């Protein structure tokens, strides 16, 4: 509760605060990094030991960039208001079965130490079990996209650096001022002003009636691995 205003905490019943804390603890007790935990439910006193007029979202994921922002964006896209958001990063040790062995001091390092992000949110109440499941699935898909982008961020940045270097040597039929503007823009992107999410490579092959755009399936990085351009034959011809 470190990031929650005291005024908000004092408005909650102690039993509900204890209940949601124990619920999050149960999520933390066992974890497989290959299968991030996402749970969306309507707290019920009989089932969960606490209650809320909102739906609860519990998330446990290996700590990587963009997690919180991605959750917010997906919930906003679906029209859910966020009433409570708690996010904590833990340094932990687990055994080979994923069972929690130790919570270490913040930022602790070591070969057997994992950094894990635990999130708890309360959002507009979902009206049915089906809606809860749909939201769980949507958040899992969002995290899958985040992992793709994070895993390939450095390779995508390297591709951008290659392109920037190529511009210094390329003999292009464009005005010098225009080419210089492109170079400056590429350098600005590479100076940590842009988050690379996906990469796809196209080449142009000459043909008798003009040219053809060739889509390199092996070039895909980041989100492009799941969100492909999917050019149709009519889209690849250049007159």
Question: Can you say where each PLM-predicted feature lies in the sequence?
Answer:
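Charge-rich interaction surfaces and accessory domains that mediate macromolecular binding and assembly
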Residues: 1-58, 73-76, 84, 88, ...
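Short, surface-exposed ligand-recognition loops at beta-strand->loop->(often short) alpha-helix junctions
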Residues: 60-66
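Helix N-cap motif at beta-to-alpha junctions
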Residues: 64, 125-128
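Ser/Thr-Pro-rich, acidic low-complexity intrinsically disordered regions of eukaryotic RNA-binding
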Residues: 67-72
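Residue-level detector of anion-binding/catalytic polar loops
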Residues: 81
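Beta-rich nucleic-acid/ligand-interaction surfaces
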Residues: 88-106
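A structural-propensity feature for long, helix-poor, extended segments
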Residues: 104-118
